[in-house]
Every structure is written in C-alpha cells, then in structure tokens.
Amino acid sequence: MIWTVRDAQVALAPVFEQYGVSRAVLFGSIAQGTATQESDIDLLVDSHLRGMKFVGLMEAIRQVTERPVDVFDVTHIERGSPLDWEIHATGLTIFENAI
C-alpha cells in the first residue's frame, strides 16, 4: 500500500488521541505525494511524552501503520537545522487537539 496524507490522518488520529498528542505534522515523501510502497512515515509531534511513554507512542504508530516510522517531538528539533527546514517546507498538520 502506498500511504497518502488522508490514510495517515485516519489511521493515526486515534493513536494521537490515546497518547495525548496536541499536534502532529506529517512531512517527507507522504506529505509531498511522492511516497512508494517502501516509504517510511515521518512525523513531528507536540506532546509531553518522554522516555518510555514516547517510545510507546512510536511503537503504537508502527503497529497501526505497519511501516517504519521516524517520530520527532518538537523539543527534539534544533531550530534552523536541515530537518527543521524540511518540516517547515513540506510538513502538513494531520492532527490538532484543541484542548
């Protein structure tokens, strides 16, 4: 299966809600519409999860999507880094919890 932005939104919203994620941004090949069957899922999340709780979120995403995932918390991204630029250039918000 080649994942789309909509696929990611639908599949991951329950996971984000369960783990208390306040915002999730999809970036990389899926966000750009250039994904292949081998593409991983690249996500930036705004959460208060640390340590094993963050690992639990990553594992839940991996289980739901059955794909390799790269998940970064907003606190992991160095401002102005190449990754920060990529997220801002290609990122699409796929989840926002308005609590």
Language-model region placement:
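Catalytic core of pol beta-like nucleotidyltransferases
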Residues: 1-23, 32-37, 48-99
